[in-house]
Amino acid sequence: MSKEAYKGTVRLTVAQAIIRFLSNQYTERDGVEHRLIAGAFGIFGHGNVAGIGQALLQNEIAPAEGENPMPYIMPRNEQGAVHAAAAFAKTTNRMQTWMTTASIGPGSLNMVTGAATATTNRLPVLIFPSDQFATRIPDPVLQQLEDPTSLDVTVNDAFRPVSRFFDRINRPEQLIPSLLNGMRVLTDPAETGAVTIALPQDVQAEAYDWPVEFFAKRVWHVRRPPAERAAIERAVAKIRAAKRPLIIAGGGTIYSEASEELRAFAAATGIPVADTQAGKGAINCDHPCSVGGVGSTGGDSGNHLADKADLIIGVGTRYSDFTTASKTQFKNPDVSFVNINITPFDAAKQSAEMVVADAREALVALTEELADYRVDESYTAEIAAEREAWAAKVEQCYHVGNAPLPAQTEVFGALNELMGDEDVVINAAGSMPGDLQALWQAKTPVQYHVEYAFSCMGYEVPAAMGVKLARPESEVVSIVGDGTYQMLPMELATVAQEGIKVIYVLLQNYGFASIGALSESRGSQRFGTKYRQRGTGSHLEDTDTIAGVDIAANARSWGIDVLEVQTIEEFKEAYKAAAASDRATMIHIETDLMGPNPPGSSWWDVAISEVSVLESTQRAYEDYQNDRKPQRHYL
């Protein structure tokens, strides 16, 4: 198209055009607007320092008229940057995110894990990996991987399977449709995930005459599709026919901001509500229909009701194997499913009656159609009894009095008592998500932030930064095990650098508690799951000296205040001090590697060696054969 067809043009580099365009992108839902891209995380190298780096500098010190600021933060690791962006997006219910940029080769590849974490969790992040020269004159450039079978393949093709949208810009004019489609995916509640646009380093710096309309304010209206009338009628028929219905609330309930409608629906119908990791807090824990977590790491109340349910109503859940207990949780031979989900892919799971719609819109419609419906009083009494019995077990776990080291459940109990309803607790990996899902009492949708789709070790440290950027008014508490800490601790330096006040609770047990317990139960004797200094044996033994990192000293070296405690009472006092401080603080406490953990009533399928010379493995395989017998497809 000729220049004359536009109202005018402006000459900018590709990188400058990206920043100016992104500074004027907004989302809108329910009449509320937000800046879609709230800021930029970036680590610069030769692949982006003179492109995106220059554009961010120019935005900061010499922005053009109509160009909004693009706040920039320098992280320490590219994976951590993407985790922070994803945590920010999760906290804003996917209305906002951050962009990330890295240099070519290893810097860009470091973002692949973060992209997978975001996409698995259905969270929008915008990633700009740098790429080799489009001209191919400097070839191979530093950090370029050569593929002799195809010269257009680069390491950034690794982003394709973990991104919801992928593109590579080899000419400036390709940027316009690429960015517009990227924004479409970021703001589509059914399609969202990682959007990756690879930028050759020479193209980033190439100038082009851009139509000025490209940089005008653009508002992306986040849709709330209602359910088809026929789908609601079919769902209503199944609910009316059920004797023991159970709702499973997933993360989509929270992202839809449908908690009020879920509470109203449960109160009107008496149908109990269990929650997934992503859905915890969708209904307040003190609601008479709230029965807590369900699945492999759920509590007895939710799981006992799930065992006998004849109808499961999934609201915004993707039915991970932890939710279904590897397809053994729903034991009623006549169980069927109604799935409310904005994504047809998830709505179709478990051969369900599909209600493809926004969760809030569908719940409103169901509440209206079921105005005269309520579960039987005997079922209501059973729900109350299950709630009461599990509440007593939660109290036992929170106050177990373990010695000589406290159990991690006691730390969680103290936090649950001390944190406010609008504060945020963060976790992702190890034994802690299981204990938290079973025990944590969440009263609001914002309080519980556990990434358990990709369950990425290392998420917790950078995630705290992203959450605090999204909710500066809240106390943000990230619970970190010593295993996950050693995967990705360096964003502590970024937190200190930016003066971001968060609280880290570091539980040090000198090993991998979760995988150690799993290893033992599967016949592998906790092999390779404890930190030990190698002795004279052929493999690490319990009798070998504990080899632990001095994490307290390490955290101080990053610029974080550290409070070291030994008892739960000391922990409570330390938390109060950390909350009163205006600096980032770590509370360090040693906990018992061997538990105890909450009682579990559900299974998880981890395949066991079919043949082995080890008796422990042979016994575990026999148990495995029995445990998997209830598995089935729900048809």
Question: Language-model features: where?
Answer:
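Phosphate/pyrophosphate-binding active-site segments
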Residues: 2, 6, 173, 211, ...
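N-terminal alpha/beta PP-like core and its mobile active-site loop of ThDP/TPP-dependent enzymes
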Residues: 2-374, 414, 418-421, 501-504, ...
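A generic structural signal for residues located within well-ordered alpha-helices
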Residues: 14, 154, 257, 407-410, ...
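Active-site diphosphate/adenylate-binding microenvironment
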Residues: 40-52, 387-462, 467
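Thiamine diphosphate
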Residues: 136-150, 347-348, 355-356, 363-364, ...
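Short, basic/glycine-rich phosphate-binding loops at helix/coil junctions
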Residues: 158-159, 209-215, 387-393, 552-555
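Short amphipathic alpha-helical interaction patches enriched in hydrophobic/aromatic residues
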Residues: 163-166, 394, 398, 562
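Glycine-rich beta-strand-to-loop/alpha-helix junction loops that act as flexible
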Residues: 249-251, 315, 429, 480-483
